[in-house]
Amino acid sequence: TTGLDPPAGAEVLDRVRAMGMEDRMAVVRAYVGERSNRRHKPGRALERTDYRFDVISDYGAFRDLQRHRLMTIEWQELTPRHGYTRPLAIDESGLAERFDDAMATSADLWSDLSERFPERAAYAVSLAYRIRYVMQFNAREAMHLIELRTSVQGHPSYRSVGQEMHRLIAEQAGHRAIAEMMTFVDHSGEPELERLQAERTAEARRATAG
């Protein structure tokens, strides 16, 4: 047999239900142990808890998140209908009008193609346009994905998705113990500047190594 037999499993559940929050948190913290970096993962017990997220993000962020394999992901057809994301850096550089014109050109081309070539029209849609998709994965994969994708080296688009996932696990799902395990989630608020600094640090290391 595998796992706990029914009486033992029921006994464990009864004991957990009788525990206070602090006692439960103590058990969780003991299970996680000390993590010196995000590659130190807790065991497979986290695979018993699943999360499902309904996400709208720009297509560029979707493509990066789609690369994670230990999950189920389903997406709608890529179109311009959900609008697009214009980075703050575009506004600050005074290029907002040119950016919007480029997005309009992309949408017009999609419209022209969609009637005759509906399956190919998506290739005309800029990566800045939003797409809606559903991601489902267990808590162990959540820790890997969220800690990786919120790091300062990440792109702001998928960083914000990961940060919101972490918040929802803690607040909406009420799984604060699991959210607390994710000690390497970065919620800092200036991702562009931090990403630039991280790139400079990496470049300096490469130069030193070379």
Features from the language model and the residues they span:
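A conserved ligand/cofactor-binding region detector
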Residues: 1-210
